[in-house]
């Protein structure tokens, strides 16, 4: 199951990246933009499917990561950017505590192929 889920994510990510390239080449084309949101939705769907298959609380994790990302802001509530545009961690940054999103399982529950 592990391999299949990872393959699905990889496949959908590739389709999303292709749609993104096509959309950014012609951003005013409504068909390209529609394809982009469809492929992005498919990618998110298979990520949620993966989380469900392994009993991971992705909704809660997303909320915690969002809160953590918002803690990256500086004292004035503004993002701090690296030269390439990536947002840096500000003085109030708090990493997300995701342990509550991961159920305790015995590692031998899955064989070496993740099944």
Task: Explain the meaning of each model-derived region.
Residues 1-40, 44-115:
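Flexible "arm" and connector segments at domain edges
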């Amino acid at each position: 199951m592990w391999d299949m889920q990872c393959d699905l994510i990889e496949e959908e990510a590739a389709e999303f990246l292709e749609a993104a390239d096509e959309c950014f080449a012609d951003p005013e084309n409504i068909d390209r933009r529609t394809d982009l949101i469809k492929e992005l939705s498919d990618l998110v769907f298979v990520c949620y499917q993966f989380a469900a298959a392994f009993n991971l609380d992705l909704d809660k994790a997303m909320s915690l990561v969002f809160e953590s990302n918002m803690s990256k802001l500086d004292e004035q509530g503004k993002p701090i950017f690296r030269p390439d545009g990536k947002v840096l961690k500000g003085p109030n940054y708090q990493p997300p505590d995701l342990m509550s999103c991961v159920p305790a399982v015995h590692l031998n529950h899955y064989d070496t192929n993740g099944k």
